[in-house]
């Protein structure tokens, strides 16, 4: 579920023209490793420096810790029942893991790979995101139609925010959290500075996955993706995607969008500048979650059928145009 964000670069017309004349080959994408993990991996998160990834194993009640340099599991951390969502703090010191079956969040100390705290949340908790400053973690409670706000310094729930009907996923950028409400076809926007709902955005039926930069949020509703302008909180475009289920992750620079095709066991790569498909890569049956490294060089996707994490590497072209 869930990646770091940054402001998208803007440049002058003259500079853009120069880059356009010198641009060469487009980036290429390939699956460069497949790592066995625990039973039924659901979601994956990348540490800020990119050296480690974490995968939740729902069928094994554990989190696999993967060294991205060697593509090997270096630790397995026992957590609560049915772990699903996971997010890492910006300093990399903690990983927050949602245990859906236990209605709890396990807080992993990443220095020791041990659980430092367990926090009670709501029923059918599923997803978690951490604010850009690392001060708070946000957890969806589907049955209660709320989001729990956790103070990461004290590991306590300090607020519960009512949102739309049956929230299942969420994503944070520098200032807001975007929550997909699957039963009333909306996205709730929470201001992270005030912990209040500032907008509710209608989208297509049964929104699920969401990912965001400081400029845009991308919301999946089955085989359709909605693009939300973060400045106006309006849907500015929609486009089709492969399959109807699976996660989504956009790189911090906004240049690449990865969308999981769960039914097809693949990850589709999109160019957000044109909202068009670039390529599709096989990653394993019942692909689920996807996350990207902070530098955008790699993405990681789960295969629930094969109990693996696929590494997707992006090789840059001769030049990459900012958008």
Per-range role (PLM):
Residues 4-323:
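Predominantly soluble domains enriched in secretory-pathway, periplasmic, or organellar proteins
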């Amino acid at each position: 579920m869930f990646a770091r964000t940054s402001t998208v670069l803007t440049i002058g017309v003259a500079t853009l023209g120069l880059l356009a004349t010198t641009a060469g080959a487009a980036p290429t994408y390939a699956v460069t490793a497949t790592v066995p993990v625990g039973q039924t991996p659901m979601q994956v998160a990348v540490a800020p420096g990119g050296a480690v990834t974490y995968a939740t194993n729902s069928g094994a009640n554990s989190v696999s810790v993967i060294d991205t340099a060697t593509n090997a599991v270096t630790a397995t951390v026992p957590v609560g029942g049915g772990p699903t969502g996971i997010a890492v703090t910006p300093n990399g010191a903690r990983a927050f893991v949602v245990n859906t079956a236990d209605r709890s969040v396990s807080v992993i100390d990443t220095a020791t790979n041990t659980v430092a705290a367990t926090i009670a949340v709501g029923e059918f908790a599923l997803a978690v995101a951490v604010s850009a400053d690392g001060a708070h973690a946000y957890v969806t409670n589907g049955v209660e139609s709320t989001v729990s706000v956790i103070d990461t310094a004290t590991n306590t729930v300090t607020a519960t925010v009512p949102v739309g009907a049956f929230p299942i996923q969420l994503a944070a950028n520098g200032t807001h959290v975007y929550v997909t409400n699957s039963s009333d076809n909306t996205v709730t926007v929470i201001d992270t500075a005030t912990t209040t709902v500032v907008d509710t955005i209608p989208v297509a039926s049964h929104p699920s996955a969401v990912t965001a930069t400081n400029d845009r949020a991308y919301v999946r509703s089955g085989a359709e993706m909605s693009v939300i302008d973060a400045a106006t909180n309006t849907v500015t475009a929609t486009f089709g995607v492969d399959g109807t289920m699976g996660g989504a992750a956009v790189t911090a620079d906004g240049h690449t969008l990865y969308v999981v095709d769960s039914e097809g066991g693949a990850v589709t790569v999109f160019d957000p500048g044109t909202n068009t498909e670039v390529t599709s890569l096989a990653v394993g049956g019942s692909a689920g979650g996807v996350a990207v490294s902070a530098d955008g060089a790699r993405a990681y996707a789960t295969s629930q059928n094969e109990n693996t994490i696929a590494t997707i590497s992006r090789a840059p072209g001769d030049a990459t145009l900012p958008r």
